Curated annotation (Swiss-Prot):
Binding sites annotated in the UniProt record for substrate: K126, W155
Segments of skewed composition (Basic residues): 346-356
Native organism: Caenorhabditis elegans
Pathway membership, UniProt: Phospholipid metabolism; phosphatidylcholine biosynthesis; phosphatidylcholine from phosphocholine: step 1/2
Name of the protein in question: Putative choline-phosphate cytidylyltransferase
Binding site for CTP: 88-96, 126, 172-173, 177, 200-204
Keyword tags: Lipid biosynthesis, Lipid metabolism, Nucleotidyltransferase, Phospholipid biosynthesis, Phospholipid metabolism, Transferase
Biased composition range(s): Acidic residues: 321-331
Catalytic activity: phosphocholine + CTP + H(+) = CDP-choline + diphosphate
Compositionally biased tracts (Basic and acidic residues): 1-16, 332-345
Amino acid sequence: MFIHKQEKMPQRKRTMDSPQEEDVEVKKKATEVEYVVRSLASDEPAPFSDEALAITTREAVDYSKKITLAMAEANEAGRPVRIYADGIYDLFHHGHANQLRQVKKMFPNVYLIVGVCGDRDTHKYKGRTVTSEEERYDGVRHCRYVDEVYREAPWFCTVEFLKNLKVDFIAHDAIPYVAPGEEDLYEKFRREGMFLETERTEGVSTSDVVCRIIRDYDKYVRRNLQRGYSPKELNVGFLAASKYQIQNKVDSLKSKGIELLSTWKSKSDDIIRDFIDTFHKDGGLNAFGGRLKGIMSMSRSPSPSPHEGSPTGIEHHLETQDEEEEEEALEEEKVVEQKIVEKKEVVKKRSSRNKAKTPLEY
């Protein structure tokens, strides 16, 4: 346990040097001394009733004076009030813990004894349990609200049994439990003024937990087969085990197929986006084609000799082409002029020969 202490601050005294404060009360924030005691859970499990610690505690109890309900509520018993609660506590769950918590909080100072029924009586009167009696004993004794555990508690509890344990009160819910010769097992404790009523936790019980397991039986069997349990350990036949294994394979393929489709969807989005970027009018392919055309047109024209002030690129190519065409035209004109001159010479020679001939030659 730990103790938290807050100290009270001293008040300021009046002085003669401040007469203006004589008729004014000086108030200062102060807190009273408070001791907050909180019990912490033990790091040891609760003892069994036949162990030395429980026996010593029981023998030290003065059971000669009957503890009434009023005395217990007012914490006037002079010792911890001993309360007994019993049950099967199969598959110990929060509904069981809530019942024991309610009992522990009945009075300011409670010593809680929990009786756990053994397998023999439980199987006889209620049916088979999921966990064994030893597992149920250990499950209860590790609950923080429990001070002592009574193993193989009687199925039909009696007043004499409680007195032997020096129990002051017995706690249970208000549902009647039929016993041989009795309509309600706990009615006699009501008459003795020893009965305390607890409330059941709605929505949870051992039967509900078992019902959930049965409802989803196939899922749990398939899961445990995947985890390495053998069909024999699960009490499953060969055909049933084969069916579950096939179902597991089918589910695995479905899962992989869904994953593949999801991956393909994301990849297809990327492919479509790349296609649009490539073949769009402003895309990469058209830009590449434009660059390729420019390169090919430049490769077909002679490279200009680089000098300062000379045109470059397409302009230079066009200027060069015009100059070549002009030179070719001049050459053709020269050839034509030369042919005309030659033709004139031939005509002159023929005319001179004709003049030199006599008439007899004709």
